[in-house]
UniProtKB/Swiss-Prot annotation:
This is D-aminopeptidase. HAMAP family: D_aminopeptidase. It comes from Cereibacter sphaeroides (strain ATCC 17023 / DSM 158 / JCM 6121 / CCUG 31486 / LMG 2827 / NBRC 12203 / NCIMB 8253 / ATH 2.4.1.) (Rhodobacter sphaeroides). One of its GO terms (biological process) is proteolysis. It catalyses: Release of an N-terminal D-amino acid from a peptide, Xaa-|-Yaa-, in which Xaa is preferably D-Ala, D-Ser or D-Thr. D-amino acid amides and methyl esters also are hydrolyzed, as is glycine amide. Keywords: Aminopeptidase, Hydrolase, Protease. NCBIfam families: PRK13128.1 (NF009622). The keyword Protease applies. Homodimer. Inhibited by beta-lactam compounds such as 6-aminopenicillic acid, 7-aminocephalosporanic acid, benzylpenicillin and ampicillin. Inhibited by p-chloromercuribenzoate. Belongs to the peptidase S12 family. The active site is at residues 61, 64. Residues 476-486 are annotated as: Important for specificity. The keyword Cell cycle does not apply.
């Protein structure tokens, strides 16, 4: 396969304008050789420190594959350590996930970063290493039985890292260095778990081109699920190492990139900290990463021996940027689908308790259900499709098939309500699942929700009606990124009286609150 280097250069030149922000880096590896390496903008606007290919940036959740690689290379068979998962979930009432299901995001556990919102955290407050395990230990139920579906969950990898350090008696930073950083030639990569002290004093920026950019104030400690800082030079060395070891079936990347599956045998889209997807017409493994002020993405197309890395110190889509580079290098033009019509509306999934909203525009559909919106267009058969998702109708119901999640949703239409009296739902509620409270206040037509729990009393969040006894709670900023977004809140009644609520977002579904 021959790269279109001219097209790749043009795509690289376009990144600073298409994905506007303080700075970024991007690189491409083909057949084990670096064919492109770019750095633009500034690592710190105020101090005028330029971004360089040697500037270390947080790669965030891309770290998950390094955790899984160190696990397999150090401990081998994960099944031998399954019993240890129970130590971290002492109150769990259902079947426990295996260590492999943690690595494959098939645990069914709720994401602990989303739960920090419900435990009363503020976006910029300090979250110490010792704060995580007590929060995880409160879990009593999950989204679904382990191994039956996919749900992104950071605490899966926190548990994995704790078991790995305990079994080896060694720090994760040393295992990374010995098993991956050293062999791969990642000379400056290291585990920098405390986000208050970023490597090379790089600054990440919240905001946008429309409102301006301001430094992100991060205070979380993360390990296993994220925490590695690496330069573009380090990441391109990693991609070259992957290519150099491609024919060794015992190499770390070959082992973590084996095709995953659910317990029923259905192929899965995520395994050992790697996402398996199709980008620019080719199969890739990779991962994204996010922290307030930073975005990262890497792709590896094994058959084409091609890798792409993009990291920003702002919040533009690194996934879209990396996809554009892959498409340019391969000369791929995405087929233009037709614009579906007559799909706009909102529905409620009775199983997850989550709202589905579909909007139409000139380019197609926007589906809002998971953490981020899905874009869909119609194929020749008229079916709206996007990456790993499609829509159909069964009468008035909306059928959403998320093949990447092993999930089919049959959602019921929800009439639109623009104005509702929050007075009858105002008050305090308690969630046994979380051992935490929710307070709703209503005044002069406005409604707000505040969460109180293990981490304090958080800021009041906006509460808006969307349907009969259905509201959304809006969380736009949180400790981790991206934030949970819109939580769906359903009112529960007995004999017409409000007795409780059910709250959930894609990362943390079906949490019941009883009125106090």
């Amino acid at each position: 396969m021959t790269l279109d280097l001219d097209a790749l250069d043009r795509a690289l030149d376009a990144l600073p304008n298409l994905f506007r922000g303080p700075g970024g880096v991007a690189g491409v590896v083909k057949d084990g050789q670096v064919v492109a390496s770019r750095a633009w903008g500034y690592a710190d606007l105020t101090r005028r420190r330029p971004m360089e290919t040697g500037t270390r940036l947080p790669i965030c959740s891309i770290s998950k594959q390094f955790t899984c690689g160190a696990l397999l290379d150090t401990l081998g068979d994960t099944a031998a350590y399954d019993a240890r998962v129970a130590e971290f979930l002492p109150q769990f009432e259902g079947p426990l996930p295996t260590l492999r299901q943690l690595c494959d995001n098939q645990s069914g556990l709720r994401d602990y970063w989303a739960l920090t919102v419900l435990q009363g955290a503020e976006a910029a407050q300090t979250f110490r290493r010792e704060d995580a395990l007590p929060l995880i230990a409160r879990m009593k139920t999950g989204h679904f039985p382990p191994g039956t579906a996919y749900s992104y969950c950071n605490c899966n990898f926190r548990i994995v890292s704790e078991i790995l350090e305990s079994e080896t008696g060694r720090a994760l930073r040393d295992l990374y260095a010995e098993r991956i950083f050293g062999p791969a030639g990642m000379r400056t990569a290291e585990l920098t778990s405390d986000t208050r002290h970023p490597a090379d004093e790089v600054v990440g920026y919240e905001g946008s081109d429309a409102v301006g950019f301001f430094p992100a104030d991060n205070g979380i400690f993360w390990i296993g699920d994220a925490g590695i800082s690496a330069s573009l030079q380090d990441m391109l060395a990693y991609e070259s190492w992957i290519d150099a070891t491609r024919n060794d079936e015992n190499s770390i990347y070959r082992r973590i990139s084996v095709p995953p599956a659910y317990v029923c045998g259905t192929p899965a889209s995520y395994g050992f900290g790697l996402s398996h997807e199709t980008v620019a017409g080719v199969k890739v493994t990779g991962h994204g990463g996010a922290l307030r002020g930073f975005r990262a993405q890497r792709f590896h197309a094994a058959d084409e021996r091609l890798s792409v890395v993009v990291i920003f110190n702002h919040e533009a889509s690194a996934h879209a940027a990396a996809s554009s580079l892959l498409a340019a290098a391969l000369g791929h033009e995405a087929p233009k689908g037709a614009r579906p019509e007559g799909w706009a509306g909102q529905w409620l999934d009775p199983e997850s308790g989550l709202l589905l909203r579909v909007g139409e525009d000139a380019e197609g559909l926007t589906l809002r259900f998971a953490t981020g919106p899905d874009r869909l267009t119609a194929g020749e058969d008229g079916v709206p499709r996007g990456a790993g998702v499609s829509l159909a109708r069964e009468g008035a119901m909306l059928v959403m098939n998320r093949t990447s999640d092993n999930l089919t949703v049959r959602a019921e239409p929800l009439p639109v309500v623009a104005v509702a009296d929050a007075g009858e739902i105002a008050g305090r509620y308690h969630a046994r699942e979380l051992e935490a409270d929710l307070v709703i206040e209503a005044r002069d037509g406005g409604a707000y929700a505040g969460f109180e729990g293990l981490l304090g009393a958080g800021p009041m969040e906006r509460l808006h009606p969307v349907g009969p006894d259905v509201w959304i709670v809006t969380t736009r900023r949180s400790m981790d990124a991206p934030a949970p977004g819109d939580w769906t809140l359903q009112v529960r009644r007995e004999g017409g009286a409000v007795t409780g609520l059910r709250l959930g977002c894609w990362l943390a579904r079906r949490i019941d609150y009883a009125r106090v």
